Every structure is written in structure tokens, then in C-alpha cells.
């Protein structure tokens, strides 16, 4: 049995915002945690598409999107940090210049080479592109979880890549056996 003071590692987990989430930035969100350690945490909101699609974004960065079925794929709000920067969450390929490999078979890439590969049709088959990320300083996320701000569950890539954005919150809750209609923002302490 782990010590109550043992550090927890939530890398490759979903954070599911509780109804009582104090920060409206994260209300109703599911965050995929790409990294969590003693220095803090970094994740991407996976269920908040913004009013821009891949074709429009690629035009803005002077890339021609040759794979037309991807043109209308939404870009997502990844979080409030560095919202002008792109973050690509995709199946692990190990072939891009600036990727963070996440245990569980995914990578988060911030270099333009992944977008160039997508534009040519040679990029990852499954990916989402976010603008910005969510970040927490050391101990901050653990404190928010302790205040009943988040639920955590092992991530399922199928939810990220194959479930429509508007259904990802409910799908993540179902991983915990929770009916979204029955979720309360009130914390109970024995």
C-alpha cells in the first residue's frame, strides 16, 4: 500500500472537471495529462473546439493542406497558456523534432514538422491540434483535486480520437461508471 504522502503521477490520465469547478476556463472540460511530476503538470483540453478548422489554421501558417478530408477537422482550445502556439496530440511515431512521449502510446508534438507531415498526408493518422495548453505548478493540481475540482481516470485514446468533442466529457465519466446526470459538485467528507 502506498504511503499517503507518496507522490502521485497522473500522466496519461484524464482530468474531468467537476460541476463545482471554480475556474470557468475549465468548466465542463476533459484534460489529457501529457506530463505530471514533482515540478507540476501539463495537459491539453480535448473537448473544446474553437471556431477555426485545420484548413484555416494551415493557411495562416503558409501550409497547404493536401488531404482534403482533414480540412474541416476542428482546432481545439488546449488551455490558457501559450494560446498562440500549436500542440499536436497524436499516436506515437517518434519521428518529430520536438515531441514529448507519453506512456500509453501517445506523443505531444510542438514542432512544425508534424504539421508539415499532416499537410502532405504523411503525418499521424490520429491526432488533435490544440492552441494553448493547461499548466499547473508543483502541487497545484493535487490541491485542486483535493478540493474536489477534478476527477481522474486512466485515459482512453479512443475517446480522444474517435468520440465527437461534445460527447467526450460524458464518455470520460463513463470510464468511472458515472452517469453525468448524477454528478454533483458537492464534496462529501466522512
From Swiss-Prot:
Pfam families: DUF179 (PF02622). SUPFAM superfamilies: VC0467-like (SSF143456). GO terms for cellular component: cytosol. It comes from the Bacteria. Belongs to the UPF0301 (AlgH) family. This is UPF0301 protein RSc0675. It comes from Ralstonia nicotianae (strain ATCC BAA-1114 / GMI1000) (Ralstonia solanacearum). The lineage of its organism: Bacteria, Pseudomonadati, Pseudomonadota, Betaproteobacteria, Burkholderiales.
Amino acid at each position: 500500500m502506498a504511503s499517503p504522502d507518496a507522490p502521485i503521477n497522473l500522466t496519461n490520465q484524464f482530468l474531468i472537471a467537476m460541476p463545482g469547478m471554480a475556474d470557468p476556463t475549465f468548466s465542463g472540460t476533459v484534460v489529457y495529462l501529457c506530463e505530471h511530476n514533482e515540478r507540476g503538470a501539463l495537459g491539453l483540453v480535448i473537448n473544446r473546439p474553437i471556431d477555426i478548422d485545420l484548413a484555416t489554421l494551415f493557411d495562416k501558417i503558409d501550409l497547404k493542406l493536401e488531404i482534403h478530408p482533414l480540412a474541416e477537422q476542428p482546432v481545439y482550445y488546449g488551455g490558457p497558456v501559450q494560446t498562440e502556439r500549436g500542440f499536436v496530440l497524436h499516436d506515437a511515431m517518434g519521428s518529430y523534432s520536438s515531441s514529448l512521449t507519453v506512456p500509453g502510446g501517445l506523443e505531444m508534438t510542438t514542432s512544425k514538422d508534424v504539421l508539415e507531415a499532416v499537410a502532405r498526408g504523411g503525418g499521424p493518422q490520429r491526432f488533435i491540434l490544440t492552441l494553448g495548453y493547461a499548466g499547473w505548478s508543483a502541487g497545484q493540481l493535487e490541491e485542486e483535486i483535493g478540493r474536489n475540482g477534478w476527477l481522474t481516470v486512466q485515459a482512453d485514446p479512443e475517446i480522444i480520437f474517435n468520440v465527437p468533442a461534445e460527447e467526450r466529457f460524458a464518455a470520460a465519466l463513463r470510464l468511472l461508471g458515472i452517469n453525468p446526470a448524477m454528478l454533483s459538485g458537492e464534496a462529501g467528507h466522512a
